[in-house]
Amino acid sequence: MHHYPDSAVLYRSLTKDFPLAVRGEGCWIHDESGRAYLDGVGGAYVATLGHGVREIAEAIGAQAARLAYVNGTQFTSEPAEALAAELARRAPGDLDHVYFLTSGSEAVEAALKLARQYWVESGVESKHKVLSLTPGYHGNTLLALSASGRPRYQTYFKDWLVSVPRVPAPYAYRCACRGEGSCPACTGDALEDAILAEGPETVAAFIAEPVGGSSTGATVPRASYWARVREICDRYDVLWIADEVLSGAGRTGTWSALEWYGAVPDLLTMGKGITGGYVPLSALHVPTRIADVLAKGSGSLMHAQTFSHHPVLCAAGLATVRYVEQHGLLERCHRMGTLLHQKLEVLRDHPLVGDVRGRGLLAGIELVQDKASRAPFPRSARLTERLVEAAMAEGLVVWPNTGHADGANGDLVTLAPPFVVTEEELDEIIRRLLAALSRLTTDD
């Protein structure tokens, strides 16, 4: 095991031991001792293709040997042009231009800045506010963090963050209507209420994840929700930014999660699975009607990043989207996702499990102290952390989240295995997760 301060690495956690990963194959990660871990969440919702796909590695190497780097202010490149065309072809509606960056946070930051620049260049400088869902998450750069409904992540930086008015998320399990009624949060009317409260003339954009990520444990809004959001944004001239960094690139069984809803946003971000995790890459989709305003005004998006439009990263993305298409992985994700959700139903009988939900190969398991009242455990119980540790002891990797119930309390874990997961591996995920849950009840 490796830990701080014995290593020169400043780890993501300075209080835990890390196994040293040395090899990956399919849905499995192997450490230096030879132990295999079933990667039930693709690292961080990233490893869509599975580990060890030679075609992606070879595409990266070939491009690095041919042309490793050019700056986006001076040149374009074949991989950037080809990948942008492929992504535009797959994107919903008129999102026909793509700006490449290297992380989801950067893509969100660029989208928010573009929204503001668009209104200024359109002569509507009063539009400067961004609205977002809570709970919700959009990244760790300061503007993206400001838009995130994750109080714990903001604790040390509150003085640096901008004020972002909050809209209650369509979080059916935590809503009094349980997703079946006409409450403003679940219908989308809460967005209109928030816009009117702030003043439509001041609201530039609304940002949200089409299917909930880790913040709400894969919550799926009702079928009419995003059409209602589109209607509201059109009525009040608000740009709708769809954050598909997590839910996009096929994770829900379609390339964009919004395909399930038939709604088209004004801007859309993607990341994580766009390269299957082989290199860092993210994308901001922009329609011509917005890009034209900049082209006829200042002439550029006022957002710079040294590695934007990087040819090697774009080559990896191009190889990934072609691999997904050639191997039918969207259809496979949908099919295996249906199986996963069928198999997860057994967890509902466990005394700690309050809800199981999701879409495609994205699933959330919410843990509660009392099923009838949906009361969460107190944060002091560290239930999520203990479950993650128990799962690792069983050789299963899952993703944790806390605080979603009321801003402080709440426990859930999410699953997002690679699209190449087999039915036998799905069974193994369920078996190991149940064993980890049993460790908690036995310990208690």
Predicted stretch roles:
Residues 1-444:
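Conserved N-terminal phosphate-binding loop of PLP-dependent enzymes in the Aspartate aminotransferase
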